[in-house]
Amino acid sequence: SLEEVHHIPGAFWPVNEWSVKNVDQLYAINERMVMVFRTAEGERFAMVMVAATNVGAIRLAFDARFDSTKRPSGRKGLKVRYGRDSLRSDLERASGEYEDADPIHLKKGDEAGLFAMGSSVVLLMDQNLATKLQLSKEKLASLIGRPVQVGQSL
């Protein structure tokens, strides 16, 4: 289940070989959408969609509030927690933080979001979850730099 999403405004450096080697903390300074999931077994992992030059449009398939082409004044971020009851609507609109009672459940292969032109996705998980998913260091290394399509098995 999807637990929360964070839109983090940032820069739009190109995500190419030169930038990866020369721009310190490139993936941390570019604009990002961070989705935090919890598996049925309770393990958490994060999927980070990283914007880049010419790829400033990140949209989420399940929540229209997350559309990085809409630039709020002052470039404020946005955060939503799903599966929680909340009556803070006025405060939420002012702070950019929301809590939704309805949980979001994505099945394996479901579309989570899209880039208008494509960019980088970073998956963060602990070693135990990687082992359960049979993602060895060798298998992960073989995926570096390769394009991945929606629904494609890793």
Q: What are the functions of these language-model segments?
A:
Residues 1-154:
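Contiguous, well-folded functional domains in the mature portion of proteins
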